[in-house]
Design a protein with these regions (language model features):
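P-loop NTP-binding core
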Residues: 1-262
Length: 262
């Protein structure tokens, strides 16, 4: 199983949409995908019609065992989605309490990695929707992953947030055997605005090697898919947003192949 994290230390950049869009396209290609909602706000969980405040069980259960994960527990927590090839490991608001509980508890940074290790025979891909704050949850997402997607909204405050994320990644990489490859993905691009055009140029100038040369445009069909509770490609496989995500997926698969060869 390949594990991808979608993360940025800034909210509202399209993390959840990107996670679900990529999962939907992988499922369309016949892959089995587990999507992991690690954001206490539960946007991914809500997307598929579940209420993070009322779920009896969630991935918070995985963190209740001081770093060990009981055999079989991850599989018991999985929920169905709009696509039979996509399963959801849901979030709950209780995840927000982990940051207060985590000091002094060893092993909490590897809970998701250990959980996904139990599911590797059942899925081809795992996609983790990370919270926007650096803490035990983001550390879990990055520690479990072999590849990182960093969505960046094309607006003037985005570059600062991206720089913080890149610095965080450098810190995480010091404890990894291999550096985590990443792709910067410009999102919510609107060619009609100077802000989008300027930010895209700045991102390409500052991160020429790391940035994907395409972009995800503003597309109301992506919002409509969310309202319908289905993946963007299920809702409208030929929308501008989905076509952009198809190109992004092709780029990520090529990057994955390079990493595997290396």
């Amino acid at each position: 199983m390949r594990v991808w994290a979608v993360a940025n230390q800034k909210g509202g950049v399209g993390k959840t949409t990107s996670s679900i869009a990529l999962a939907g396209l992988l499922a369309e290609a016949g892959k089995r995908v587990v999507v992991v909602d690690l954001d206490p706000h539960g946007s991914m969980t809500s997307y598929f019609g579940y209420d993070p405040d009322s779920l009896e069980h969630s991935n918070y259960d995985l963190f209740l065992h001081k770093g060990s994960v009981p055999q079989g527990l991850p599989g018991q927590l999985l929920l169905s989605t709009s696509d039979e090839r996509i399963s959801l490991l849901p979030s709950s608001t209780a995840l927000a309490t982990l940051e207060r509980q985590s000091p002094g508890q060893s092993g909490l940074g590897l809970v998701i990695a250990k959980s996904l290790a139990q599911l590797w025979q059942d899925f081809d891909y795992a996609i983790i929707d990370s919270p926007p704050l650096l803490g035990v949850l983001m550390v879990n997402a990055l520690a479990a992953s072999q590849q990182l997607v960093i969505p960046v909204q094309t607006e003037h405050l985005a570059v600062k947030g991206l720089e913080r994320m890149v610095n965080t990644l450098a810190m995480i990489n010091r404890s990894r055997k291999q550096a985590l490859p990443f792709s910067i993905v410009p999102t919510l691009f609107d060619r009609r605005t100077q802000a989008s055009m300027h930010t895209l140029r700045v991102l390409r100038d500052k991160f020429p090697e790391e940035i994907w040369q395409g972009y995800i445009p503003v597309d109301t069909r992506l919002r409509d898919a969310s309202r319908a509770g289905v993946t963007p490609s299920q809702f409208d496989g030929k929308s501008r947003g989905v076509l952009a995500y198809r190109a992004l997926l092709k780029h990520l698969l090529a990057q994955q192949l390079v990493a595997q060869v290396a």
